[in-house]
């Protein structure tokens, strides 16, 4: 599927002003004057008065939960893929944080692979720290 987004206020990450984009599958195929294509296979979306930004990168995400500094009651739950997508995040770097007792590298790696399978790009930093 090819999607043509027209009249969007585009940031990439610098402001490009109002412009058009072509998206082929999950990739930006063309931007600006090169984003001119029509036909039966092209879906057009009018983004007038809307902002168009690339997927954001969260470089420190507690994808298997965070917290724990205040004991077991202060732990937080795992990240859901919808939480990332609704925030515009398409790439994550998962970390353990302070809790390497109840959260493990195996869990972190498994969650990163699961998020990859759900459509996000996910990496891991290994190790943790104690407070």
Model-derived features with residue positions:
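Short, mixed-charge, low-aromatic patches
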Residues: 36-39, 64-71, 128-129
């Amino acid at each position: 599927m090819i999607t043509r987004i027209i009249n969007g206020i585009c940031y990439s990450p610098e402001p490009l002003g109002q412009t058009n984009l072509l998206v082929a599958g999950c990739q930006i195929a063309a931007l600006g004057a090169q984003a001119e294509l029509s036909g039966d296979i092209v879906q057009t979306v009018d983004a007038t008065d809307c902002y168009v930004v690339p997927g954001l990168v969260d470089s420190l995400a507690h994808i298997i939960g965070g917290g724990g500094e205040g004991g077991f009651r202060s732990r937080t739950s795992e990240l859901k893929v919808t939480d990332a997508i609704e925030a515009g995040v398409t790439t994550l770097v998962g970390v353990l944080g302070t809790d390497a007792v109840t959260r493990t590298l195996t869990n972190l790696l498994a969650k990163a692979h699961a998020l990859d399978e759900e459509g996000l790009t996910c990496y891991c930093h290994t190790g943790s720290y104690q407070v």
